[in-house]
Amino acid sequence: MANSLYQKHIISIPELSREELELIVETAGNLKKEPRPELIKNKVVASCFFEPSTRTRLSFETAIQRIGGDVIGFDNDGNTSLAKKGETLSDSVQVISSYVDAFVMRHPQEGAARLASEFSNGVPVINAGDGANQHPTQTLLDLYTIAETQGRLDNLNVAFVGDLKYGRTVHSLTQALAKFNNIRFYFVAPDALAMPEYICEELDEAGIEYSLHTEMEAVIPELDILYMTRVQKERFDESEYAHIKSAYILTAALLKGARENLKVLHPLPRVDEITTDVDKTPHAYYFQQAQNGVYARQALLALVLNETL
């Protein structure tokens, strides 16, 4: 099938249409059921991580190799000429892009992926995270996981819990789900970490229902998806952190009134916001969610590098 993602830069979720998101989700499901180990045979993909990463880098590199591609690159730029010789990001991108067919990049600077796309000489750039800005491939694996567990991406009640102010994963996933029909959001956070105003304004403009909460227990029975995030200790003094942290810990006991189909997701790593007794419940799905990153990234790479599949 022809696809509009061929040779497209993947920089942010708002730039992807509902149809493109559905195509990625469908392709990920197909690749999970039936591996295709030669989809990007003879293609070379750069995996350039200018800040440390574990899950995203390993997931991407596994995805590349499992569909037949070769990978070059680095993790943490401390030993590269960019760091040691003062080379600009734009120069690095121009050189590296001349070696490869696609360019996967994580960078601590917001907007770095967009900048890279302007200097990649037409080689598609895939944003693996640029500061607190966007992390689109995390959103793609989240969407695939939701579709896999619920059988749909329309008609869902979804709660985000914890750090909604700084968590780029919840911003991107909210924007993605807003493209679907009859989605209701529950934003559960302390006032200091509430969902940014611009996200709420986007939902208001689109006529999408959402509600703000400071406690999660009351909303759990309403949910299809409960998306937990880590409250970042470094943003609070010790006493304030201890109070906030204790209000946003999910236990198995809190899930007793949950719908049978509820799945608990988390972008990982978790610290103590989900207790280990939740792992044994049928609602826990965060480790399978992480595994799905390989399939979602396989699908994205295959679609970006092939005009038809």
From Swiss-Prot:
Gene Ontology cellular-component terms listed: cytosol
Catalytic activity: carbamoyl phosphate + L-aspartate = N-carbamoyl-L-aspartate + phosphate + H(+)
Domain of life: Bacteria
Residues that coordinate or bind carbamoyl phosphate: R55, T56, R106, H135, Q138, L268, P269
Keyword Thylakoid attributed: no
Enzyme Commission numbers on file: 2.1.3.2
Organism for this UniProt entry: Vibrio parahaemolyticus serotype O3:K6 (strain RIMD 2210633)
NCBIfam families documented for this protein: asp_carb_tr (TIGR00670), PRK00856.1 (NF002032)
Record note on quaternary structure: Heterododecamer (2C3:3R2) of six catalytic PyrB chains organized as two trimers (C3), and six regulatory PyrI chains organized as three dimers (R2).
Keyword Cell membrane (UniProt): no
One Gene Ontology term of the molecular function aspect: aspartate carbamoyltransferase activity
Pathway info: Pyrimidine metabolism; UMP biosynthesis via de novo pathway; (S)-dihydroorotate from bicarbonate: step 2/3
Family designation: Belongs to the aspartate/ornithine carbamoyltransferase superfamily. ATCase family.
Keywords assigned by UniProt, alphabetized: Pyrimidine biosynthesis, Transferase
Residues given in the record as L-aspartate binding sites: K85, R168, R230
Protein name as annotated: Aspartate carbamoyltransferase catalytic subunit
GO BP: 'de novo' pyrimidine nucleobase biosynthetic process; 'de novo' UMP biosynthetic process; amino acid metabolic process
UniProt xrefs under InterPro entries: Asp/Orn_carbamoyltranf_P-bd, Asp/Orn_carbamoylTrfase, Asp/Orn_carbamoylTrfase_sf, Asp_carbamoyltransf, Asp_carbamoyltransf_Asp/Orn-bd
